[in-house]
Regions:
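Well-ordered alpha-helical scaffold segments within catalytic/enzyme domains
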Residues: 143-144, 148, 193-206
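Low-complexity, acidic Ser/Thr/Pro/Gly-rich terminal tails and inter-domain linkers that flank the onset
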Residues: 1-7
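Helix-terminus loop motifs that line ligand-binding clefts
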Residues: 175-177, 203-234
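Short, charged/polar micro-motifs that form catalytic or ligand-binding hotspots
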Residues: 2, 90, 182-186, 196-204
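Conserved hydrophobic/aromatic pocket- or pore-lining residues that grip, position, or stack substrates
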Residues: 160, 195, 214
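Residue-level signal for well-ordered alpha-helical scaffold segments within enzymatic catalytic domains
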Residues: 105, 197-198, 209, 213
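Acidic/polar, glycine-enriched structural segments that form the non-catalytic walls/loops
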Residues: 7-9, 16-187, 208, 220
């Protein structure tokens, strides 16, 4: 399972370890409540928008929600191969596996309708996986390489670098380390500045991206609702 450009790609591998043919029923349940971040953290809302009826096709379900701001938000699920049956809250597979046979099921969870493709999920999974790996290699290739005679230390460094780049988002101004996943997956000013300072030796491009992005988001006028004033960042 991995995320790329607003889409969650998932592969389920089913394997029959028996010497006989086996038939199984697999139900995949799903739902979307479109709760905002504060609701998820336990803060109740006085009013909510309206969830629409699921739009169900042979291999696709669209779940949508009309917010109080008048915007419609949607989550789309695509399945490959086509399920035996499908409804607005689950997909059902009736699968027969021969002795030692393995079979893969592919699921796409699309959070931005503009990211939806017409290619079968099996093909999009592997092409997206290659793109994700290339993007990660490009980003981490900027980092300085640290190798010592202590393999435990080396692994700690590799893990730390991998975790750092998991938080990295490419903005128009350059790479920017978001504050945390999942609660704070957005731009924080001081957190990013501290990270940029401490990683100058590792990857100077992070500091460049942080400074340029913060400079691009300086207020130019007074706006009490946004707590903005000239020169203030974010």
């Amino acid at each position: 399972r991995f995320l790329l450009n607003g889409v969650c790609y998932e592969r389920l591998l089913l394997r029959n370890f028996d010497d006989r043919e086996r038939t199984i029923r697999l139900d995949i349940a799903f739902a979307a409540d479109f709760a905002d971040l504060f609701e998820i953290r336990g803060k109740p809302r006085a009013k909510r928008g309206q969830s629409a009826q699921p739009e169900v096709e042979a291999d696709r379900v669209r779940l949508s929600y009309l917010g109080l701001d008048g915007r419609t938000r949607a989550t789309i699920l695509r399945f490959g191969p086509e399920p035996s049956s499908i409804a607005g809250d689950h997909a059902r597979y009736q699968i027969t596996l021969g002795p030692r046979e393995a079979r893969s099921l592919f699921i796409e969870i699309i959070c931005d309708e503009r990211s939806e493709e017409k290619t079968p999920p099996r093909k999009t999974f592997f092409s997206a996986l290659r793109r994700a790996r290339r993007a990660l290699r490009r980003s981490s290739a900027r980092a300085a390489s640290v190798v010592t005679s202590n393999e435990i230390f080396n692994e700690a460094v590799r893990r730390s670098v991998a975790d750092l780049y998991m938080l990295m988002t490419d903005t128009p101004e350059g790479p920017y380390p978001y504050a945390g996943i999942p609660w704070f997956s957005t731009v924080f000013g001081r957190d990013a500045l501290i990270t940029a300072l401490e990683t100058l030796w590792l990857d100077p491009a992070i500091a460049q991206g942080v400074l340029k992005h913060l400079a691009a988001n300086q207020a130019v006028d007074f706006n009490p609702e946004a707590d903005a004033e000239p020169g203030k960042i974010l």
